[in-house]
């Protein structure tokens, strides 16, 4: 079977590099092809009768559209494997090593500005140690540097585009009204238009999060 890879339009360079690695490792170019473009290209691929199935990672909205396209296309029934709208979580109890846990939490939640499907979104902490971990998380987060990710000693970069930033700011605005307390990175707001300050919200329930937030936002429960 042949595979066509289509990365998100804003991550075309990464898509090219990943496919290049596969080709260099011995996968025939005829077996793995790369297509770049926006949602028009995605719609064409998922509606094409020659496509037997789709594997997709992204938003629930996009997955629903892909599923509809596959169902409406001509030919036999086609398969869809989708990973969407995830809220990756970590559970911390009193047996955990605080320094190691907090380092792992910050790296998972905030490196790449949280723009990874595997990024940590929710941190569950045992009640008895919640205040201790909250204070240590606040202290440790301030040690990370925000700026141009191409520069040395910079840990956290910008959001990929304005639409993503606007969605994140809307989520932050809503949570500010209901969060019990907040941790915010203390960097100056002069880095550029697409930077969002890493932020941690303590919330009462996972039900306060109604969608995946693809950015530097961590929810502490």
What does each model-identified segment do?
Residues 192-197, 211-218:
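Conserved glycine-rich beta-strand-loop-beta hairpin in the small C-terminal domain of fold type I
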Residues 33-37, 92, 220-221:
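Short acidic-hydrophobic, aromatic-tinged amphipathic segments that line or gate anion-handling sites
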Residues 21-26, 47-48, 53, 60-206:
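ALDH superfamily catalytic-core signature
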Residues 6, 35-37, 57:
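Structural motif
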Residues 10-13, 39-41, 60-61:
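Short alpha-helical
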Residues 33-52:
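A structured beta-alpha segment of the ubiquitous adenosine-cofactor-binding alpha/beta core
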């Amino acid at each position: 079977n042949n595979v066509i890879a289509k990365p998100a339009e804003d991550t075309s360079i990464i898509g090219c590099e990943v496919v290049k690695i596969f080709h260099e490792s011995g996968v025939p170019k005829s077996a793995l092809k790369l297509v770049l473009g926006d949602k028009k290209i995605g719609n064409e691929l998922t509606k094409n009768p020659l496509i037997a199935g789709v594997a997709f990672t992204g938003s629930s909205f996009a997955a629903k559209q892909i599923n509809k396209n596959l169902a409406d296309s001509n030919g036999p029934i086609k398969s869809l494997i989708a990973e969407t709208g995830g809220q990756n979580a970590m559970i911390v109890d009193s047996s955990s090593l605080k320094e190691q846990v907090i380092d792992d939490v910050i790296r998972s939640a905030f490196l790449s500005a949280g723009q990874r499907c595997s990024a940590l979104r929710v941190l569950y902490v045992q009640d008895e140690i919640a205040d201790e971990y909250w204070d240590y998380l606040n202290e440790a987060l301030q040690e990370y540097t925000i700026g141009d990710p191409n520069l040395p000693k910079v840990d956290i970069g910008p959001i990929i585009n304005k639409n993503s930033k606007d969605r994140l700011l809307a989520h932050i605005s809503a949570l500010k009204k209901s969060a019990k307390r907040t941790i915010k990175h203390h960097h100056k707001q002069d880095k550029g238009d697409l930077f969002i300050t890493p932020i941690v919200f303590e919330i009462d329930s996972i039900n306060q999060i109604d969608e995946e937030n693809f950015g530097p936002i961590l929810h502490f429960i």
